UniProtKB/Swiss-Prot annotation:
Gene3D superfamilies cross-referenced by the UniProt entry: Coatomer, gamma subunit, appendage domain (2.60.40.1480), Leucine-rich Repeat Variant (1.25.10.10), TATA-Binding Protein (3.30.310.10)
Chief location category: cytoplasm
One record GO biological process: endoplasmic reticulum to Golgi vesicle-mediated transport
Domain of life: Eukaryota
High-level lineage: Eukaryota, Metazoa, Ecdysozoa, Arthropoda, Hexapoda
Name of the featured protein: Coatomer subunit gamma
Gene: gammaCop
Length: 878
């Protein structure tokens, strides 16, 4: 009875993990068993399992431990036990990246991969390729070629997949195996054919003509593997997108014809892949899309849950790009709302939300509410994203949608789920003025019982930004001050900042805010006390300019670049005053695009956004003498200076400093028989510019990206900074062996290569900024410290106000304010408000009044702290 009771208790506790309490030290000591003779296969398998478990649980072995374990493991090759041998292969693969001298087992693995025991061969190939590098690959090349065309499918697949892995480190050697891969394409085994196509494409993907020939050949043949056909469809789609075939020619394209014929394939997998590919292609018309949507509509009523899920997921993804076509499937989607598979039901209803009429919103929301509590957070986020899109489409329905979202906020859920809801409510508040009051009220209720610190801080920031301009700002004070009393120090500090914004923006509430901030000075936390004292001191001055600069429009510098600038200042001339205005601003928080693809929804933490300037700072810091230029003001996106398929490809990134520009040229040598040295770019400078330094690239081997720099000083006059530069790539060429990459001799010859011209524009020299309250900043700029330039233009190249706004934003490179970059439909008058900082720290505010009649008339007013900058920006439009 006692034994029965113990067994019953163990059963109640659930399954236990026999390896959960392993210690690395004791397991490594057990590896001594591997040296025993004869080999105890059963015991060794158990020890190897422990080692693999520890490694896969994240336990790290130092090189000495891994090497000792590896060499002990090699003794097990004397055993003929099949299971033990395969465990040894797994151990070799896991330890190969840490242990030293792993090539000692090459001969044993080569013997196994060429032996007669098929159970060994495939695993031996995988293990061998995990320890092989490009220097010793030629020794096993003959065996790899034989295995690729082996009659045993498992061996052939292992060789093909291992070849794909080796192609990343020894691409030149693997390219020589193309004939064997081509032969493997004729295999009757579906997996061999699939992997062979994958290897062939990888070998030829850098040669567009070779890929086109491969696809044209295979589309005319009949592939037996549905997996290979699916891959061929994807390759064909990539070629179509790269060629950018116009709509009227696309239907006659052999590639599109092939994809269309796959809609009639006998495999459901291929049919779906073809339909998915067609609906996601650009430049398609209704006639081309119709068969694909018919297939998806048919799959919606399939008895197989996988087909229903695939079809509705694809419809959900393209609902915003092809709403009319998806609407034809609405009846089928309505039927899927009650599907037993909740994932299918969720996708169906979110698709209907994206394409449905305004009158159906209430009915759909009622249907969602019946099962939303039963689905996972992952799919709840999909629902929230669909509601966000619906709010943008039907702003008058914000009350219904906001109430639904507030109900979801009160439910249980993880941080990412709650964040998606808060993001949506904030988006509605920012884009719909009518929804501001109700949105803020819902968020106030949420933070009363919010367990996520990051969300509470975000909401308090929003309340400080939007609350003072609501109809009755005083009603939010209680919610904010409650956080000071009840929350953690981080939230209390955010609440103090929010209170100060009410005091700065609402004179009627200033007296009460001063009392509350005075109480916060007694807080036990240093940060809270310091903030309260700081804001209290500023508010007591009753100076509007201080309110604007230090409370309403606080400096939002990039912390990484601010730290670097301060370190440089401390290492330099301390007598000179530190100028914070030259430090670039932090990346503006931009609302992420709504993902229509449910597979992209993930619970992984979001990495912090890094600006291009922060990314460039550490790399540029390695250049000699770069510190004297100051912090990076702006780094541009890369521009291509050559065609993508030329002998040498060069792209340029412009790093703008206060008085200098650093041209970064990323160079790639695509010729395997050439080794380049002393690579540099020679610029033809416009008048006023001066070259200060050229940093050449010493060596440029085949297929390695290397960088050369040119440092140029701007003219003293800002108006002369807009210019075009000629560029020539100069280098020394040495012939080399394509297999080794080593030059044949020490002697070379000088050569050059002409590059495309480059421009420095106004947008290159301006760092975007975002004003929380543009009108306050504009009014404050009406002073003697600010200078103004004004002009009127007729924009003949554009026909709509939205096109005009987009053009102005592109030319000037400024950040928009108050969502003025979006022009409401049906309007003939619009005002664009934007701001930024010119290199050197000159602030810029722009107000562009647009009127649409027969053309677009623009009245542009620019205010800046520098007259030359104001005139330069005005001239840029003309």
């Amino acid at each position: 009875m006692g034994s029965f009771r113990r067994d019953k208790e163990e059963e109640d506790d659930g399954p236990t993990n026999a390896y959960q309490n392993l210690e690395k030290t004791s397991v490594l000591q057990e590896t001594r068993t591997f040296n025993e003779t004869p080999v105890n296969a059963r015991k060794c398998i158990h020890i190897l399992t422990k080692i693999l478990y520890l490694i896969n649980q994240g336990e790290t072995l130092v090189p000495r431990e891994a090497t000792d374990c590896f060499f002990a493991m090699t003794k097990l090759f004397q055993s003929k036990d099949v299971v033990l041998r395969r465990m040894v292969y797994l151990g070799i693969k896991e330890l190969s990246s840490v242990a030293e001298d792993v090539i000692i087992v090459t001969s044993s693995l080569t013997k196994d991969m060429t032996g007669k025991e098929d159970l060994y061969r495939a695993a031996a190939i995988r293990a061998l390729c995990s320890i092989t590098d490009h220097t010793m690959l030629q020794a096993v090349e003959r065996y790899m070629k034989q295995c690729i065309v082996d009659k045993n499918a498992a061996v052939s697949c292992a060789a093909l997949v291992s070849s794909l892995r080796l192609a990343t480190t020894a691409g030149d050697v693997v390219k020589r195996w193309a004939n064997e891969a081509q032969e493997a394409m004729n295999s009757d085994n579906i997996m061999v054919q699939y992997h062979a196509l994958g290897l062939l494409y990888h070998i030829r993907k850098s040669d567009r003509l070779a890929v086109s020939k491969l696809v044209n050949k295979l589309t005319r043949s009949s592939l037996k593997s549905p997996y290979a056909v699916c891959m061929l469809i994807r390759i064909a789609c990539k070629l179509i997108e790269e060629e950018d075939i116009p709509s009227e020619e696309l239907s006659d394209s052999p590639l599109f014809t092939f994809i269309e014929t796959c809609l009639r394939h006998k495999s459901e997998m291929v049919i779906y892949e073809a339909a998915h590919a067609i609906v996601n292609l650009k430049n398609t018309n209704h006639r081309m899309l119709s068969p694909a949507f018919s297939i998806l509509q048919l799959f919606c009523s399939s008895p197989k849950a996988t087909l229903r899920f695939a079809a509705v997921r694809t419809l959900n993804k393209v609902a915003m790009t092809h709403p009319a076509a998806v609407t034809t499937c609405n009846l089928d989607l309505e039927g899927l709302i009650t599907d037993s598979n909740r994932s299918v039901a969720t996708l169906a209803i979110t698709t209907l939300l994206k394409t449905g009429a305004e009158s159906s919103v209430e009915r759909l929301m009622k249907q969602i509410s019946t099962f939303v509590a039963e689905i996972s957070d992952e799919f709840k986020i999909v629902v929230v994203q669909a509601i966000c899109a619906l709010c943008t489409k039907y702003p008058r329905k914000h009350t219904v949608l906001m109430n639904f979202l507030s109900g979801m906020l009160r439910e249980e859920g993880g941080l990412e789920y709650k964040t998606s809801i808060v993001d949506t409510i904030i988006t509605i508040i920012e884009e719909n003025a009518d929804a501001k009051e109700s949105g803020l009220s819902h968020l106030c209720e949420f933070i009363e019982d919010c367990e996520h610190v990051s969300l509470a801080v975000r909401i308090l920031h929003l309340m400080g930004k939007e609350g003072p301009f609501a109809a009755t700002p005083s009603k939010y004070i209680r919610f904010i001050y409650n956080r000071v009393i009840l929350e953690s120090p981080i939230v209390r500090a955010a609440a103090v900042t929010a209170l100060s914004q009410f005091g700065a923006s609402c004179p009627a509430l200033l007296t009460n805010i001063l009392v509350l901030l005075g109480r916060c000075q007694m807080d036990p936390d240093d940060e809270v006390r310091d903030r309260a004292t700081y804001y209290l001191t500023i508010l007591n001055t009753e100076r509007a300019d201080l309110y604007k600069n230090y409370i309403i429009e606080r400096e939002n510098c990039s912390l990484a670049l601010l730290e670097k600038a301060l370190v440089d200042h401390l290492n330099g001339d301390l007598e000179k005053r530190f100028d914070i205005s030259v430090v670039p601003k932090a990346a503006a928080v931009v609302r992420a695009e709504i993902s229509n693809d449910v597979m992209l929804v993930t619970s992984a933490p979001r990495p912090p956004k890094i600006t291009r300037e922060e990314e460039s700072a550490s790399r540029l810091a390695q250049l000699p003498g770069i510190q004297v230029l100051g912090p990076v003001h702006r780094s541009t996106a890369p521009i291509q200076l050559t065609e993508s398929e030329t002998e040498y490809t060069v792209q340029c990134i412009k790093h703008i400093f206060g008085q200098h520009v650093v041209f970064q040229f990323d160079c790639l040598n695509t010729l395997s028989d050439q080794f380049l040295e002393n690579v540099r770019v020679e610029l033809t400078l416009p008048e006023g510019f001066t070259t200060r330094a050229v940093v050449p690239c010493p060596k440029l081997p085949y297929n390695e990206l290397q960088t050369t720099y040119v440092i140029v000083e701007f003219p003293p006059d800002a108006g002369s900074s807009i210019a075009t530069f000629g560029a020539t790539l100069r280098f020394v060429v040495k012939d080399c062996d394509p297999n080794t990459g080593e030059p044949d001799s020490e002697e070379g010859y000088d050569d050059e290569y002409m590059l495309e011209d480059m421009e420095i524009t106004v947008a290159d020299q301006i760092q975007k900024s975002k004003k929380n309250n543009f009108q306050v900043a504009w009014d404050a700029a009406d002073s003697e410290e600010w200078l103004q330039a004004e002009d009127t233009f007729v924009l003949s190249a554009v026909t709509t106000l939205q096109d005009a706004v987009n053009t102005i934003m592109k030319i000037l490179g400024l950040g928009s304010a108050n969502l003025s970059e979006k022009v409401p439909e049906g309007t003939h008058l619009h005002t664009l408000l934007c701001s930024g900082t010119f290199r050197g720290g000159a602030e810029v505010l722009v107000r562009a009044k647009l009127a649409l009649s027969e053309g677009v008339t623009l009245n542009l007013t620019v205010r800046s702290t520098d007259q030359d900058v104001a005139e330069l920006i005005t001239a840029a439009i003309g």
